[in-house]
């Protein structure tokens, strides 16, 4: 974290929503290694029922999950007045869904497997931080 202010970075909570536990844990490990606080959820409904909505600085969510999809979550949050930056990750990329997510304000749309640098760049953009070298 040479170019990052640890106190500023660690105060940002990033919520990770994915029905695949191994993906959640991998993303959570990467984000924690960057100094961010994280909260992980197995579904969009679990996130919506949590007390983390108001203190989440960025959401990283799977696109396709049982119950509410990532796009459904984005719609619900926007309808409720929450403009939390969102980054979508998916094993099933679709140009139509990508366009919809980005048009609605998503900061990234990554296909699984994605490289860590791409995810970090999306997080930095979402949090308006400089991208590390």
PLM feature segments, named:
Residues 112:
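A Lys-centered signature of the CheY-like receiver
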Residues 80, 91-95:
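Short, conserved "switch-loop" micro-motifs in signal-transduction and mechanochemical regulators
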Residues 1-15, 21-28, 117-133:
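Non-catalytic signal-transmission and effector/linker regions of two-component phosphorelay proteins
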Residues 62, 90:
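Active-site residues of response regulator receiver
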Residues 65:
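Receiver (REC) domain active-site loop signature in two-component systems and cognate sites
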Residues 42-43, 69-72:
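Acidic catalytic/metal-coordinating carboxylates
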Residues 40-58:
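Acidic, metal-coordinating helix/loop segments flanking the phosphotransfer/catalytic sites
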């Amino acid at each position: 974290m040479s170019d990052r202010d640890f106190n500023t970075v660690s105060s940002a909570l990033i919520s990770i929503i994915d029905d695949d536990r191994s993906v959640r844990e991998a993303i959570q490990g990467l984000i924690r290694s960057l100094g961010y606080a994280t909260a992980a959820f197995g579904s969009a409904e679990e996130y919506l029922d949590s007390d983390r909505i108001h203190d989440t600085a960025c959401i990283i969510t799977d696109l396709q999950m049982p119950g509410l999809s990532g796009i459904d979550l984005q719609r619900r949050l926007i309808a409720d007045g929450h403009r939390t930056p969102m980054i979508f990750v998916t094993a099933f990329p679709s140009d139509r869904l990508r366009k919809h997510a980005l048009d609605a304000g998503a900061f990234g749309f990554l296909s699984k497997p994605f490289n860590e640098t791409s995810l970090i760049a999306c997080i930095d953009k979402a949090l308006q931080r400089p991208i590390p070298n």
